[in-house]
Structures are given as structure tokens and as C-alpha cells.
Amino acid sequence: MARLQLAGSRRLVPLPRRAPRLAPLLLPLLLALPDGARADCPCKVPALCRPMTHRPDFEVFVFNVGHKTWKYYDWSQITTVVLFLKYDPELMCHAHAKGARVVLKGDVPVKDIINATFRASWIAQQVKLAKTQYMDGINLDIEQDVAHSSPEYYALTALVKETTDSFHHEIKGSQ
């Protein structure tokens, strides 16, 4: 083992000799990961962690509310799964293997989105969550009443546009 002596110190710090030899081997492996796939991809096939980019002619949404009922879906019909509860990496891998998108459910109190700073922060959090979980976008599911021409009305319009722009910029092919 090589030793490093710090100037003005009598302490010796052992340095492993094999580490420099591993770095050139690891770099090509990291570079070989498909776009959108990272080393922490939960799928057996890392390519399944890439965002789905195809655009179907029509959409068939499934709103997943948990458990493992997704194992019994007719995957030949489904284009998008919206997760209403806890993230399930097994579901994400399976859906991507079947060519279906998996998206977040986006819900936020309408009174809060009037504040542009809050709105931007909420959108950034959703994008980060979607990217961390290898998801393909977001389904805004806001079911609160909004009066026509109210501040909430215009804020909701801004939320939809800003969310769409952010997701499309950050996740290729996202919804």
C-alpha cells in the first residue's frame, strides 16, 4: 500500500493502489448506461428506466390506487398509468416493458398556486420526483371549483402551461 505524508504532519495515510486502476474500467460502464438510466435503476433491464417517447394515436388511462392489481391489467390496451398512491418501482418497470407510460398524479390546492413562487417550486418538486422515479410525466388532477376570471382561474391556466413546459423540457416525450 502506498502512503501519503501530509506536509508538517507525521501522520501517514494509506492509499489503496487498486483504485486508480478501476477508474478507467468504470467510466465506460457508466457512459454505456442508456439515456435516462442511472445506476440506481430498479429494473432488471436498465433501458426500462428511459422515458417513454412514443406518441400513441389514442390514450387509454388507468388510475392505479395501489396494491398489485396492475398485474391483472390488459396491458395490450393501456397507454398510461397514473399513480394515485405510493410509487411502485415494479409497476414502473412492468409498464415500461409493456410500452405504457407511468405518470404522477398532480394535485395542489388552487389557493396556493396564485403565488408564482409557490407554483414554480411545486412544479420543480414534481419534475424532480418524476425523474427520480423514472416516470414519464404528470396528470394534473385538480378537482376544486374555480370561478371564471378569478385569480385562481388564471393561476390554474399558468400552472398547466408552466408544468407542461417544465416536464417537456426536463423529460423527453413526457405528458
From Swiss-Prot:
What's any one GO cellular component for it?
A: lysosome
- The residues that the database entry marks as glycosylated are N115
Task: Give the similarity note.
Answer: Belongs to the glycosyl hydrolase 18 family.
Per the record, the coiled-coil ranges are none
Lineage, highest ranks first:
Eukaryota, Metazoa, Chordata, Craniata, Vertebrata
Question: Could you tell me what this protein is called?
Answer: Di-N-acetylchitobiase
MF terms in GO: chitinase activity
Matching InterPro entries = GH18_Domain-Containing (IPR051887), Glyco_hydro18_cat (IPR001223), Glyco_hydro_18_chit_AS (IPR001579), Glycoside_hydrolase_SF (IPR017853)
Against PROSITE patterns, the record matches this protein to:
GH18_1, GH18_2
Keyword Iron-sulfur assigned to the entry: answer is no
The EC designation for this entry is 3.2.1.-
Name all GH18 domain ranges.
Answer: 39-175
Q: Where in the cell is it found?
A: Lysosome
Q: What does this protein do?
A: Involved in the degradation of asparagine-linked glycoproteins. Hydrolyze of N-acetyl-beta-D-glucosamine (1-4)N-acetylglucosamine chitobiose core from the reducing end of the bond, it requires prior cleavage by glycosylasparaginase.
The UniProt record lists the keyword Lyase: no
Active site at E143 (proton donor)
Name the UniProt key words of this record, in alphabetical order: Glycoprotein, Glycosidase, Hydrolase, Lysosome, Signal
> What domain of life does the native source organism fall in?
Eukaryota
Give the signal peptide range. Answer: 1-38
Q: What is any one GO biological process for this UniProt entry? A: chitin catabolic process
Q: EC class of this enzyme? A: hydrolase
| Classification via PANTHER family | DI-N-ACETYLCHITOBIASE
